[in-house]
């Protein structure tokens, strides 16, 4: 939610915040309106509301999913929530936006936060739009509500574009259609559909499009100008740059940006309308098409394209100011626009006519795009239901929103996609026509608005030129924003996932650079693909669309491949290649200028048309129609040839251009051209577009050439961003691109390793470009894959193409949509997550990264598949190898072997030569080692998802995809390392085998990871952390990708190491992604506490977008499974296949695996060292073999170990595994394990995100290798193992086959779970990779038993993994206090449940993580109390996660220490469960099982070790690894395999159990763990005294203990040997006991203790309620164990033998005076009065006197009152009063209160023991504490308002008289219904009043005292009611108790005597004042004693 907030803030920045400000009323206003609208539109909120809901659902899909479903309640509820959360977030984040003077941002912002932007937006859409007039609505809503509307759309887009939006589009399509019909009655029915979508996305847009096109344009301009107006917001826009940027753009380019975001998301999958929106967004760079963008954005395309165009163009429209701001805004917008674009795409898909109209209205270009969008839109309407359903289902998941968007895009598009293949985006409905039309439209638009429509090219150019050149400072200020805008546009139109990835990538690495690289990449791609410039750009921008259809392939490829196509094929190829290569090489600034210059300049025509007019036409027509053919061919050629060329020119150019981008491009060598590219694409794209064009450009650069786009982009980014994004570009792009694009670009840059000096740039640009690259790459790859698949260019990467195409063609309708849905959802989720987290983390960075992650991931998925390997290969230098995978995905399978070996070899050089560039080394290694990895590295976020999806769809591709998924996950993790939270989260989903999950993972990875890492990488990453983070993250990620990819590939191929790393990488990247998810859910948890609750819900919604995707992805998965069940098994088991390959290769290439492990470990170790992949690569190469390998295996260890144990148990892997285990713990203990978390965390801890980033940056690689090694071990190992095993079932040994069988179950689940695992991994990585490791472990277990979904879901909420995950988490919640999660879960549970089943693994991993997180958060206190099994499981988790939490908290404390810990804790426990499941599941792969066990053990140990600290944590982590290493490795792989076999068998059961019961999370999975957990508990309890890690191990053992005899023994052995190693390793890092204890304390120490001695060891404050006849319920607050004991004694003795309060002075005889009884609080009374003390007339907490105690009624009167537990109610009332008066209380001194409480406890005599006193004390504790009465406890609420007549008068007179803020307090004295006979007293007043005693709950003497007091006039205040008289005889001074204190009377507490100032003892006089105060204190105590 923070991401939401921040995203909201960003979005809200422009439009949402003012709307937020105005929106609060407006939202409230909207509430009814939205209620109306929602009611009217059935949840669409009338489109406006629906959009709001959609946006809000998108954004708050997790939280708002259910609300989204009922938009009315959701929006209204969310309006309140938005108002709170959204307004909160927006207010907090968007105060500048409000300052910026855009009311829209607030609204958007409101819609942004939860569904915050939804309601305003929805309201804006429906009612506000309606009320404001549709045109006016668009304008007004653009202006006023448009921001919200945009935010809705944007947030919907960015957050869960598909989620809420799709939910709305599901219901809202109808509702929105209703609303839009209402609006569209003004517009058209076609527009209605589109407007439905658009209204959903940009309800105001459709109308303005029809009625208010100009108005919409004005609105857009208005918002655009708003962004201009938002210079202050520009800073905010930087944050917004993450998400708010397009929201800011939404403010100025509200509709365009905001709407485009949803539309982009919708369009992303839809057609590249959204992509064009992205293209427009990219063109947003060239947003010279500002009016185009506005018109574009205003129209339906304005919905998606306007956002894009408007985003980008609008950003361009205000070329200098506005554009920069718009771009800034629009960058976030693109981020959100991605979701929005999805929505827009959906809108487009839904409203193709509207799009046409919109486009027509908006601009020719817009209409063209609109038509394209419309063409898609028509398909979208057809797919709309699917989209909506998928979206709707995932709408619960924010992810589903994006996924849905993608799903619709993919789903609908894939139908069209399958129909058109190319028109995924372009031709979702109209593949060739749509694509072409869009392309043509865009081209015409480009032509008509060359400067505007150069948007694709000029968009890139304009965006770059505008944003970067035109508004270079703004661009630079908001590189992420403009990049986000451009990137977002691109990314949004890239599959949303790609967009998310791209945005995440672009944004996180560099808000601007990221965005720019994304835009640039897309633009450069588009630009490079001039024809693909408009459409390709849109497609480029819509990797989703690109991914979504063959056209998607074309589109996706349009970005990456289209650049390649343009570059490598026909004009597109030539242009792109020239542009790409030239630009990349910077050799062709003319072409670069043509492409980039148009991009840069407002010569879209020049660049678009000049650079790609022919290419555009060719590519457009080609890619529109021929795109599939030509593009495929072009893709193949472009990608292959271009990849080859790019590899060459990319290797050279990229080497030089990456060098150039890093060096030359960074310098403004291609400043103009490259600046454009740099601005738009180069920021994310120099790495992602430029770098993606260069790296991803190499990925895309195969298409893009990464050169024209990439190099150009990169160059542009480099040059333009040279100054500002040079670090960004290189770090961002390199970071992201390094991850994804940097896998391509940075790896290219790594190719020019010296350019990894770009390492800094890479760090920034890697993230950035990688995000962009991811975006591009994924779509490029996806596009390529899809297109290649459609057009057999899939031969280029048969698997990629096959995967993507298999998905595209086989499942394009469903699978492709699923992929895209998953991507879109991921994009949305990731975008949301990214936005949320990106915003949170680095608002611009996060969002864009997330989006980039999402977008780039999908794009990367496709681009990665083909492009990436090539680009990666480029970096890897075996371009042919990389090219091979790119060349053929099938080959990619082989390539995994071929490329992996090559990569490994290259990786060796990469590791060494790139060693200095941690990122490059890793990426290079990854690329080199794994072209697949390269792809994967770029793919990680998007590719994984797409790959996963494609994987799912195409067995070959699946395997490859999974590999890529893994690699992508790895890379995403690396990217995610950049932006852990989102990135990893998204990457979790992206990395998830499941397309949706994978996409989401990628999104998460890119978003959160990149976002987080990017900030960190940007900051520390760029500095040292950037290199470290980047090197670590990017490199790690790349390395992981390499390893993962290499692991399978290299395993297949020469590399045992890559093999080793590959599984690890895949799982690790998943874990990292999940960790990132969880961390973005660190961020996600902090950030996504809201966001994590929402964003994580979204992020985990990504897996659950994977759930949506699940829906889709389920469909896809299942469809893929059915269609390509083998493929699905491969896909789902692609990780398993990869793992199998890895294992296969591991045994075959065990030495190489070892080598790879060495290499991988080296990077990992380097990462461990803070640059696991950095320079230490070489350093740790040898140690890394052990430690990095261990770390790898530790993080990735279980997966890798599982895999490697599978064949390293067979071979070296086990030693590697052991090493990895040990190293993982070592990493954990040392920098590696925990260093990734801690090192990354600590090194990146400077960066709040850095920590998460660092945890994820380092962890993605290291934790990925290490913590993921634990989580990844678990999850990835078993899951990836299973997947890989499954993928490589044939090559895998029989046990692997056995696992494969399980993989079929588990892989489906595993795949589903894997996303969630990856989500968990992301969450975990984000939080702590360890947690994710655990999560992954849990996920494997959950794989089988939904444990995964639960933890994952838990992770989701806690970690912002995903609402769906959250939802899943809820059931497994185990009373974690995951109320929000529960709520969100309930809201999103249906979809999530469904998704849980389908994506149970996907969601499961996240769930586990969330559970872990939440368990950690709330679980430790709660969990212990929770079910024993749960507690046990959570104990294990707690212990494990405690370590993780300790470490994560220590390290990832920044963003998600708690969530991380919770997640980690949960992940730990769940991981254990997962480990059980995984170990069991991995039983086939005993090694994985062992790995799982090791991981689980490792996690318990390592987690606990980690909590010790990086070192301590590492040691335990290593220890768990050691556990496995010792038990498994040391004991023997044999024992481990045996245990694993048992585990596997158990896991087999577990997978089925866990997999099938989505909610079985722990019931089945955790029951496994639990029943085992019970034993584990026992063991834990037994072993708990030793180290909690052991208990976690025990749980593991227990988990594994299903085959408990051996497993438990082994685990015990592991635990014990593990404990020994753990101790030993912990000793390495920290003594295990220490980690455990901190762990226990930190994580859930009490949970395990809770079972046995939780209360003894872990004390939870609680309220002790005793029912007493007279007193009613006596509630005692026990805040401390001492209190508990004392109160137990008191309660027993004191309550029973309550002596009169005046025990000191009076006898124990009951007073003869009448008594009062405490009665029920009067809630309804004709008498209203102030609640004041009846004795002193002062209110509660007056002068810190504490709470008022009461109400006391005369005994006669009390008898007439109903007998309730008055004490409790009164306590509540008191609490209320206390709360009310807390602020009023002058000095709430907690210390005093504590002292008083202590004194009270000391001095509490019988009174203290008295229940009433206790109640008073409790209320005082509760209320008094806050008030912190000076005499805190003396306050009794005894003021009888009615009976003490003077009370009211006293109150009023005394209030004024009280100098201590009496008047203030008086003002705050609540007017409450008071009974005339009720008395409230301060404790002090009663204590000090004569003759008042509290005996047995009866207050004696109060009436008499009151009667007397009424006659007594206070000498101090002259008011009646004095109760204290001077002790001196004859002295007539009488005081109220407070007055006595004020009068400096000496209050002697021993006998409660008062001495007036005159009669104070001379000496005591000084003392008495002191004593007065002391006496006050002691008096308070005494008084409290007296009661």
Swiss-Prot record:
Keywords: Acetylation, Activator, DNA-binding, Isopeptide bond, Metal-binding, Methylation, Nucleus, Phosphoprotein, Transcription, Transcription regulation, Ubl conjugation, Zinc, Zinc-finger
Compositional bias (Polar residues): 1-22, 121-142, 206-235, 289-311, 357-377, 417-432, 526-537, 566-576, 585-605, 618-627, 666-682, 722-731, 1481-1501, 1850-1859, 1971-1987
Positions of PHD-type zinc fingers: 1912-1960
Region Disordered, annotated ranges: 1-79, 96-432, 446-481, 502-816, 844-891, 949-1065, 1136-1372, 1415-1434, 1446-1636, 1685-1710, 1760-1865, 1966-1987
Protein name: Transcription factor 20
Key word Repressor present: no
The gene coding this protein: Tcf20
Low complexity bias (residue ranges): 51-74, 163-205, 248-277, 322-354, 396-416, 446-456, 693-715
InterPro entries: EPHD (IPR034732), TCF-20_ePHD (IPR041972), Trans_Reg/Chrom_Remod (IPR052440), Znf_PHD (IPR001965), Znf_RING/FYVE/PHD (IPR013083)
Assembly and interaction partners: Homodimer. Interacts with RNF4 and JUN. Binds to the regulatory region of MMP3.
Motif range (Nuclear localization signal): 1282-1295, 1604-1628, 1812-1819
Residues bearing PTM Phosphothreonine: 1699, 1790, 1792
Main location: nucleus
One term of GO molecular function: DNA-binding transcription factor activity
Nucleotide-binding in keyword set: no
Omega-N-methylarginine modifications at: 59, 1052
Cell compartment(s), UniProt: Nucleus
PTM sites of type N6-acetyllysine: 631
Recorded GO CC terms: nucleus
Entry's transmembrane regions: none
């Amino acid at each position: 939610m923070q991401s939401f907030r921040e995203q909201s803030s960003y979005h809200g920045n422009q439009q949402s915040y003012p709307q937020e400000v105005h929106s609060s009323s407006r939202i409230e206003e909207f509430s009814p309106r939205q209620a109306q609208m929602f009611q009217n539109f059935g949840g669409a909120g009338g489109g406006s509301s629906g959009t709001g809901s959609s946006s809000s659902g998108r954004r708050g899909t997790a939280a708002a999913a259910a609300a989204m479903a009922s938009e009315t309640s959701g929006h209204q509820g969310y309006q309140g929530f938005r108002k709170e959360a959204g307004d909160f977030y927006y207010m907090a984040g968007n105060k500048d936006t409000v300052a910026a003077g855009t009311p829209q941002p607030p609204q958007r912002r409101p819609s942004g936060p939860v569904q915050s932007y939804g309601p305003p937006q929805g309201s804006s859409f429906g009612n506000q739009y309606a009320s404001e007039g549709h045109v006016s609505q668009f304008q007004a809503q653009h202006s006023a509500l448009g921001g919200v509307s945009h935010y809705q759309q944007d947030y919907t887009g960015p957050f869960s574009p598909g989620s809420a939006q799709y939910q709305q589009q599901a219901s809202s399509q109808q509702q929105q259609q209703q609303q839009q019909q209402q609006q569209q009655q003004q517009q058209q029915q076609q527009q209605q559909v589109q407007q439905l979508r658009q209204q959903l996305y940009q309800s105001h847009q459709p109308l303005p499009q029809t009625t208010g096109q100009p108005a919409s344009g004005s609105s857009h301009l208005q918002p655009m100008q708003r962004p201009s107006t938002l210079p202050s917001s520009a800073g905010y826009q930087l944050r917004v740059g993450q998400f708010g940027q397009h929201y800011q753009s939404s403010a100025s380019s509200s509709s365009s940006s905001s709407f485009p975001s949803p539309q982009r998301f919708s369009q992303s999958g839809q057609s590249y309308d959204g992509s064009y929106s992205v293209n427009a967004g990219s063109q947003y760079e060239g947003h010279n098409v500002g009016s185009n963008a506005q018109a574009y954005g205003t129209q339906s395309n304005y919905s998606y394209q306007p956002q894009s165009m408007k985003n980008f163009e609008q950003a361009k429209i205000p070329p200098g100011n506005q554009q920069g701001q718009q771009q800034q805004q629009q960058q976030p917008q693109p981020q959100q626009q991605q979701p929005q674009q999805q929505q827009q795409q959906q809108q487009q898909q839904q409203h193709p006519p509207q799009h046409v109209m919109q486009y027509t209205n908006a601009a020719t270009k817009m209409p063209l795009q609109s038509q394209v969008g419309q063409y898609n839109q028509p398909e979208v309407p057809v797919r709309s239901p699917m989209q909506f359903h998928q979206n709707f289902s995932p709408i619960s998941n924010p992810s589903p929103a994006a996924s849905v968007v993608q799903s619709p895009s993919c789903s609908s598009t894939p139908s069209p996609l399958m129909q058109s293949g190319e028109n995924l985006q372009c031709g979702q409905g109209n593949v060739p026509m749509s694509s072409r039309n869009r392309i043509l439209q865009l081209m015409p638009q480009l032509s008509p608005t060359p400067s505007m429509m150069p948007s694709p090219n000029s968009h890139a150019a304009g965006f770059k030129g505008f944003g970067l050149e035109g508004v270079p400072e703004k661009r630079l200020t908001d590189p992420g924003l403009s990049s986000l805008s451009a990137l977002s546009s691109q990314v949004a139109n890239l599959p949303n996932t790609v967009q998310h990835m791209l945005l995440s990538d672009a944004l996180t690495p560099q808000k601007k650079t990221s965005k720019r690289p994304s835009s640039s990449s897309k633009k450069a791609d588009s630009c490079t693909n001039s024809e693909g410039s408009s459409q390709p750009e849109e497609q480029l921008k819509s990797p989703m669309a690109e991914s979504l259809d063959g056209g998607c392939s074309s589109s996706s490829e349009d970005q990456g491949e289209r650049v390649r196509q343009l570059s490598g094929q026909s004009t597109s190829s030539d242009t792109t290649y020239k542009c790409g290569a030239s630009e990349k090489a910077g050799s062709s600034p003319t072409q670069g200028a043509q492409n980039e210059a148009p991009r840069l300049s407002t010569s879209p025509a020049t660049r678009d048309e000049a650079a790609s007019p022919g290419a555009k036409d060719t590519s457009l027509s080609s890619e529109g129609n021929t795109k599939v053919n030509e593009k495929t061919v072009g893709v193949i050629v472009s990608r292959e040839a271009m990849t080859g060329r790019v590899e060459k020119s990319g290797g050279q150019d990229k080497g030089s251009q990456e060098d150039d981008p890093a060096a030359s491009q960074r310098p403004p060598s291609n400043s103009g051209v490259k600046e454009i590219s740099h601005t738009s694409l180069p920021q994310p794209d120099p790495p992602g577009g430029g770098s993606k064009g260069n790296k991803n450009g190499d990925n895309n650069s195969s298409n893009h050439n990464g050169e024209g786009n990439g190099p150009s982009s990169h160059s542009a980014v480099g040059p333009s961003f040279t100054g500002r994004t040079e670090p960004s570009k290189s770090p961002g792009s390199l970071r992201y691109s390094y991850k994804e694009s940097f896998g391509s670009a940075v790896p290219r840059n790594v190719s020019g390793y010296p350019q990894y000096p770009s390492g800094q740039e890479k760090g920034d640009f890697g993230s950035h470009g990688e995000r962009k690259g991811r975006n591009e790459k994924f779509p490029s790859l996806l596009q390529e894959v899809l297109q290649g698949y459609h057009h057999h260019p899939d031969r280029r990467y048969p698997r990629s193409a096959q995967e993507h195409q298999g998905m595209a063609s086989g499942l394009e309708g469903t699978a492709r949509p699923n992929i895209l849905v998953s991507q879109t959802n991921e994009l949305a989720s990731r975008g949301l997550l990214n936005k949320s987290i990106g915003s949170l983390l680095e608002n611009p960075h996060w969002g864009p990264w997330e989006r980039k992650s999402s977008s780039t991931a999908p794009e990367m998925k496709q681009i990665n598949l083909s492009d990436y390997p090539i680009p990666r290969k480029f970096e890897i230098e075996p371009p042919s190898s990389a090219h091979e995978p790119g060349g053929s995905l099938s080959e990619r399978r082989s390539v995994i072997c071929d490329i992996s070996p090559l990569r490994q070899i290259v990786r060796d050089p990469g590791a060494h030569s790139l060693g200095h560039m941690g990122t490059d080394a890793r990426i290079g290694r990854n690329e080199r080692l794994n072209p697949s990895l390269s792809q994967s590295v770029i793919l990680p976020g998007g590719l994984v998802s797409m790959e996963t999806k494609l994987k799912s769809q195409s067995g070959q591709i699946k395997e490859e995809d999974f590999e890529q998924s893994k690699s992508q996950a790895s890379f995403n993790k690396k990217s995610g390392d950049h932006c852990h939270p989102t990135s990893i989260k998204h990457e979790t989903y992206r990395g998830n085998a499941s397309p949706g999950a994978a996409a989401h993972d990628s999104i998460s990875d890119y978003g959160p990871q990149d976002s987080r890492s990017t900030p960190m990488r940007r900051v520390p990453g760029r500095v040292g952390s950037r290199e470290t983070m980047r090197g670590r993250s990017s490199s790690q990620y790349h390395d992981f990708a390499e390893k993962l990819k290499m692991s399978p590939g290299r395993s297949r191929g020469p590399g045992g190491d890559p093999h080793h790393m590959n599984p690890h990488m895949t799982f690790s990247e998943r874990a990292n992604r999940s960790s990132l998810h969880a961390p973005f859910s660190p961020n996600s948890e902090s950030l996504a506490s809201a966001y994590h609750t929402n964003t994580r819900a979204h992020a985990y919604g990504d897996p659950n977008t994977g759930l949506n995707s699940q829906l889709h992805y389920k469909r896809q998965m299942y469809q893929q499974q059915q269609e390509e069940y083998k493929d699905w098994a491969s896909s789902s088991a692609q990780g398993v296949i990869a793992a199998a390959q890895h294992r296969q290769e591991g045994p075959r290439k065990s030495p190489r695996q070892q080598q790879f492990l060495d290499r991988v470990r080296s990077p990992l170790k380097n990462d461990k060292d803070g640059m696991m992949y950095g320079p230490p690569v070489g350093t740790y190469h040898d140690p890394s073999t052990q430690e990095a390998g261990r770390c790898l295996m530790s993080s990735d260890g279980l997966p890798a170990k599982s895999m490697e144990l599978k064949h390293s148990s067979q071979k070296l892997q086990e030693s590697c595994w052991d090493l990895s285990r040990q190293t993982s713990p070592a990493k954990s203990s040392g920098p590696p394990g925990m260093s990734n978390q801690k090192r990354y965390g600590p090194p990146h801890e400077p960066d709040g995100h850095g920590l998460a980033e660092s945890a994820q940056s380092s962890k993605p690689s290291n934790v990925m290798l290490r913590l993921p090694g634990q989580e990844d071990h678990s999850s990835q190992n078993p899951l990836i193992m299973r997947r890989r095993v499954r993928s490589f079932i044939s090559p895998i040994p029989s046990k692997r086959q056995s696992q494969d069988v399980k993989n079929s179950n588990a892989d489906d689940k595993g795949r589903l779970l894997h996303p969630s695992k990856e989500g968990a991994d992301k969450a975990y990585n984000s939080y702590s990779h360890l947690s994710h490791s655990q999560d992954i472990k849990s996920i494997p277990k959950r794989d089988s038993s939904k444990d995964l979904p639960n933890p994952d879901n838990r992770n989701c909420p806690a970690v912002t993994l995903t609402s769906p995950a959250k939802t899943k988490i809820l059931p497994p919640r185990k009373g974690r206090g995951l109320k929000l999660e529960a709520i969100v879960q309930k809201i999103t549970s249906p979809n999530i449940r469904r998704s849980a089943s389908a994506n149970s693994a996907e969601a499961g991993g996240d769930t586990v993580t969330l559970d872990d997180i939440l368990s950690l958060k709330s679980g430790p206190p709660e969990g212990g109390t929770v079910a024993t099994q749960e507690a046990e499981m959570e104990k294990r988790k707690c212990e494990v996660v405690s370590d993780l939490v300790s470490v994560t908290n220590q390290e990832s404390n920044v963003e998600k220490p708690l969530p991380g810990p919770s997640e980690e804790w949960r992940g730990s426990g769940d991981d254990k469960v997962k480990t059980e499941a995984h170990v069991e599941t991995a039983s086939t792969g005993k090694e994985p099982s062992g790995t799982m066990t090791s991981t689980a053990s490792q996690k318990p140990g390592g987690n606990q070790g980690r909590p010790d600290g990086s070192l301590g944590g590492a040691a335990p982590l290593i220890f768990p690894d050691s556990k496995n290493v010792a038990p498994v490795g040391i004991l023997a792989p044999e024992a481990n395999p045996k245990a694993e076999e048992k585990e596997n068998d158990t896991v087999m059961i577990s997978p089925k159990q866990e997999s099938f019961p989505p909610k079985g999370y722990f019931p089945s999975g955790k029951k496994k763990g639990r029943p085992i957990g019970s034993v584990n508990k026992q063991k834990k309890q037994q072993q708990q005294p030793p180290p909690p890690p052991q208990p976690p191990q025990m749980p593991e053992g227990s988990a594994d203990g299903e085959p408990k005899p051996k497993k438990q023994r082994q685990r015990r052995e592991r635990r014990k040997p593990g404990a020994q190693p753990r101790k030993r390793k912990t000793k390495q890092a920290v003594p295990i006991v220490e980690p455990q204890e901190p762990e226990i304390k930190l994580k859930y120490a009490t949970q395990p203790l809770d079972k046995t001695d939780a209360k003894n060891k872990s004390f939870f404050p609680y309220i002790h309620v005793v029912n007493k006849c007279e007193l009613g319920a006596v509630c005692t607050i026990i805040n401390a164990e001492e209190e508990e004991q004392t109160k137990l004694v008191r309660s027993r003795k004191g309550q029973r033998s309550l002596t009169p309060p005046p025990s000191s002075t009076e006898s124990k005889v009951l007073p003869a005076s009448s008594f009062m009884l405490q009665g029920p609080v009067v809630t309804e009374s004709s008498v209203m009065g102030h609640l004041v003390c009846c004795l002193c007339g002062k209110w509660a907490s007056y002068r810190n006197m504490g709470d008022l105690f009461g109400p006391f009624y005369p005994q006669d009167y009390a008898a007439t009152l109903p007998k309730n537990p008055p004490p409790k109610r009164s306590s509540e009332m008191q609490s209320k009063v206390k709360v009310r008066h807390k602020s009023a209380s002058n000095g709430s001194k907690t210390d005093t209160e504590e002292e008083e409480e202590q004194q009270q406890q000391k001095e509490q005599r019988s009174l203290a023991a008295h229940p009433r006193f206790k109640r008073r004390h409790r209320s005082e504790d509760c209320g008094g504490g806050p008030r912190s009465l000076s005499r805190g406890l003396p306050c009794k609420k005894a003021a009888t308002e009615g009976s003490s007549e003077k009370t009211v008068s006293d109150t009023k007179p005394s209030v004024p008289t009280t100098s201590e803020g009496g008047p203030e307090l008086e003002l705050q004295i609540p007017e409450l219904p008071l009974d005339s006979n009720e008395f409230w007293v301060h404790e002090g007043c009663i204590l000090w009043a004569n003759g008042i005693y509290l005996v047995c709950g009866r207050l004696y003497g109060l009436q008499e005292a009151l009667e007397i007091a009424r006659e007594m006039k206070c000498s101090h205040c002259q008011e009646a009611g004095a109760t204290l008289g001077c002790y001196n005889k004859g002295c007539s001074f009488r005081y109220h108790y407070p007055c006595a204190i004020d009068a400096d009377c000496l209050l002697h507490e021993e006998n409660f005597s008062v001495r007036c100032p005159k009669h104070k003892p001379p000496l005591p006089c000084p003392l008495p004042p002191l004593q007065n105060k002391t006496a006050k204190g002691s008096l308070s105590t005494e008084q409290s004693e007296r009661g």
